[in-house]
Amino acid sequence: MSVGFIGAGQLAFALAKGFTAAGVLAAHKIMASSPDMDLATVSALRKMGVKLTPHNKETVQHSDVLFLAVKPHIIPFILDEIGADIEDRHIVVSCAAGVTISSIEKKLSAFRPAPRVIRCMTNTPVVVREGATVYATGTHAQVEDGRLMEQLLSSVGFCTEVEEDLIDAVTGLSGSGPAYAFTALDALADGGVKMGLPRRLAVRLGAQALLGAAKMLLHSEQHPGQLKDNVSSPGGATIHALHVLESGGFRSLLINAVEASCIRTRELQSMADQEQVSPAAIKKTILDKVKLDSPAGTALSPSGHTKLLPRSLAPAGKD
């Protein structure tokens, strides 16, 4: 089995590193494509031994399982580009927030009947094999496709199948969750520094506290509220600290953050379904394509428009 990534950003890097670290895939069995071969993640993938290409079609031809690891607004462009290259063997896995299975199936069905599509939502801790992933299978995906997906993604953390209509909520919770945790850790470390701790030690202690708390919860059958109560002695330091968090609306802020992420995911879904893309997104997509498709005698001007090079500067031997 070979795996391809359309997109060579943080998610592709995290999954590729997780798969190779888990031993489920050798690096030479992975290929990723990106129009920008100067990305830091591209360099990191290359050092791992992953094959890199600027051409999406090459990645499709190399792959059995194809991950669409690009921003939601790019998906319609990608499907139009690679649709004709999708074959019966391909399992197309979308990692794009808000992009529905039906919208992908509709696009691909214009090129080939019964495309095998899976939608997943994962997160970047897959890079250390502690990811949280859910997936939903499409109309034409086979039972074995779901099993293969679970085998792959269980190697890099927790993975389970859900109904597709739950994936937006998962995006708000665990998809965006690492960012909430990093923000909390940054603030905890600032608190430690304010009270006199060296920065490095403060970050390490905060991270270990959250890691330990998460493991305690996962290894017990107790409600998180009960575990919180177990730490809070009457009149002690912890209950006073919790009072400050409650006064600041800590719980409500987290609930609202999950809700905001979920709502934005649904907005992205609506935009993708209607193929509505912001002007800035269109400009970036076009510029990326121009970089790949420009003939040798053209160059990008500072404004982002293509301009013809003077004949004296064009490569020799081309009229």
From Swiss-Prot:
GO terms for biological process: cellular response to oxidative stress; L-proline biosynthetic process; negative regulation of oxidative stress-induced neuron intrinsic apoptotic signaling pathway; proline biosynthetic process; regulation of mitochondrial membrane potential. Gene3D superfamilies: NAD(P)-binding Rossmann-like Domain, ProC C-terminal domain-like. Disulfide bonds: none annotated. NADP(+) binds at residues 6-11, 34, 56, 69-72, 95-97. Pathway: Amino-acid biosynthesis; L-proline biosynthesis; L-proline from L-glutamate 5-semialdehyde: step 1/1. Keywords: Acetylation, Amino-acid biosynthesis, Disease variant, Mitochondrion, NADP, Oxidoreductase, Phosphoprotein, Proline biosynthesis, Stress response. NADPH binds at A8, Q10, L11, S34, D36, N56, V70, K71, A97, N230. Its EC number is 1.5.1.2. Changing R266Q: In ARCL2B; may cause skipping of exon 6. One of its GO terms (cellular component) is mitochondrial matrix. Changing E221A: Reduced enzyme activity. Belongs to the pyrroline-5-carboxylate reductase family. It is linked to Cutis laxa, autosomal recessive, 2B: A disorder characterized by an excessive congenital skin wrinkling, a large fontanelle with delayed closure, a typical facial appearance with downslanting palpebral fissures, a general connective tissue weakness, and varying degrees of growth and developmental delay and neurological abnormalities. Patients do not manifest metabolic abnormalities. Homodecamer; composed of 5 homodimers. Interacts with LTO1. NCBIfam families: proC. This is Pyrroline-5-carboxylate reductase 1, mitochondrial. It comes from Homo sapiens.
